[in-house]
Amino acid sequence: MTLRAAAVSLSALCLVAACTTIDDLPEERVGAATLRTASGLPAGTAQLLRNGDTISVAIAAVGLTPGEHGFHLHTTGNCTAPDFTSAGGHLNPGNRTHGSLSPGGKHLGDLPNLVVGANRTASTQVDLTGSATDILADIFDADGTAIVIHAGPDDYASDPAGDAGARVACGVVEAA
């Protein structure tokens, strides 16, 4: 290969590399939770996914009543039945008020309502707000984190929990 051909090839490679952004990188699974009801029945799975500096929660739920259900990240990785109160309150490292409709905006544990269809299933993926490093440190702290699904919809305003009712499913987030 001549020097000129090598220079052209190297230039082309650099142009292609310059067009690749962090957003083009594939998602990496960094955590997961198996959701269960108070009676121990499977209620779905949740995954924490990383794409560059974005962390998202992907959830697939089964066996829930049709309609909207609040779901949140909770402060403690413990899902003791029957009421799952062992999971603590919402994950709120910045000590903000609850709900996307609150004047201060939502906290880390606030997620949009999960919409369950007539077939009793739901799935969604939600991006979390903040840097990936900070989010992962908060989720994988010493006492862990749980994902909780509630019986009713979150009203996005009532502090501290959104008035979403009883906790009907819970899963402890484990690092992948």
Question: How would you describe each model-predicted region?
Answer:
Residues M1-A17:
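Sec-dependent bacterial lipoprotein signal peptides
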